[in-house]
Amino acid sequence: MIDFDGYRPNVGIVICNKVGQVLWARRFGQNSWQFPQGGINEGENIETAMYRELYEEVGLTKKDVRLLWASKYWLKYKLPKRLVRNDASQPVCIGQKQRWFLLQLVSDESAVNLKTTKSPEFDGWRWVSFWYPVRQVVSFKRDVYRKVMREFAAILLNETRKGETERSVLEASDKREYQRRETRKSARAWNHYPKGK
């Protein structure tokens, strides 16, 4: 499906782990790395397309991830002339317009499976630092990646802070509970201490 301007509607997916690293995947048979992405089928809504692509490309399902954010706007990139297919039977696709999703992996990373389809998109993956993809992706996608990661950085920072706050609250609560128990133990021990005559 290609729009009137020659752009193919597409979803892009950034998957992060609990320490803020992102999943970086190597295109099958190439030394080219990128985030999972794929086209939106005719009549398919954007979120459905994202979950379909998530499964097709990295073998994850809705239960394996938590949706943290979806970009509000379409971001576009043009393909270099050498990659533009000029097939007379189909409209010319000059690039992609994408809506991006930020997901957090909640399952174990062993759930990632690059072989769920007969024609895998990727043949390897790894965790990388959050900003690494902006510098490493092919040049014609770099501007889109920069915009996406800027938008997602604020969301992920809030998630990290929220997680740290929750951990701090739990740790403080555990510490208070420990102190209460120790105080009760001391009081009981003092009560059982023989009084002098």
From Swiss-Prot:
Keywords: Hydrolase. GO terms for biological process: mRNA catabolic process. It comes from the Bacteria. Its cofactor is a divalent metal cation. The keyword Hydrolase applies. Residues 6-150 form the Nudix hydrolase domain. CDD domains: NUDIX_Ap4A_hydrolase_plant_like. PANTHER family: M7GPPPN-MRNA HYDROLASE. Belongs to the Nudix hydrolase family. RppH subfamily. This is RNA pyrophosphohydrolase.
